[in-house]
Amino acid sequence: MSLKIRLARAGAKKRPYYHIVVADSRSPRDGRFIEKVGSYNPMLPADHADRIRLVDERIKHWLSNGALATDRVARFLGNAGLAPKPTYNEQPKKSAPKAKAQERAKAAADAAAAA
């Protein structure tokens, strides 16, 4: 049984509220779970104390028993200091325009300056 620490959607339409739960990875998003270990209310301001609530002791227990956090929950745990912050690959840099495109852009700029 593969365990995940993930978000389970609750709340009303257009008013999201999430429970942070430990669940079998095969169960539905809002379906059966093993234990509720926190909550996330995205409707509250970012600096509000109750926006993200975590039960540290139980999360540490489940992580030590092999549960894996999903991307969003891993970010929450990293910010709370319960797990290392996830690393993200840097986006590749946009390639510079080729020579013909640079010549065309320069010609257009010269024409606009002359006019």
Curated annotation (Swiss-Prot):
Q: Does the keyword Ribosomal protein apply?
A: yes
What transmembrane ranges does the database entry give? none
InterPro entries assigned: Ribosomal_bS16 (IPR000307), Ribosomal_bS16_CS (IPR020592), Ribosomal_bS16_dom_sf (IPR023803)
Q: Which domain of life is it from?
A: Bacteria
Q: Which residues form the signal peptide?
A: none
Pfam families, per database record? Ribosomal_S16
Alphabetical list of Gene3D superfamilies matching this protein: 3.30.1320.10
Provide a GO biological process annotation: translation
Q: SUPFAM superfamilies under this entry?
A: Ribosomal protein S16 (SSF54565)
The GO cellular component terms are: cytoplasm; small ribosomal subunit
GO MF? structural constituent of ribosome
Q: Keyword set for this entry?
A: Ribonucleoprotein, Ribosomal protein
- Region entry Disordered, spans: 81-115
Q: Which NCBIfam families match?
A: S16
Record-stated family: Belongs to the bacterial ribosomal protein bS16 family.
Q: What is this protein called?
A: Small ribosomal subunit protein bS16
Which organism does this record belong to? Gluconobacter oxydans (strain 621H) (Gluconobacter suboxydans)
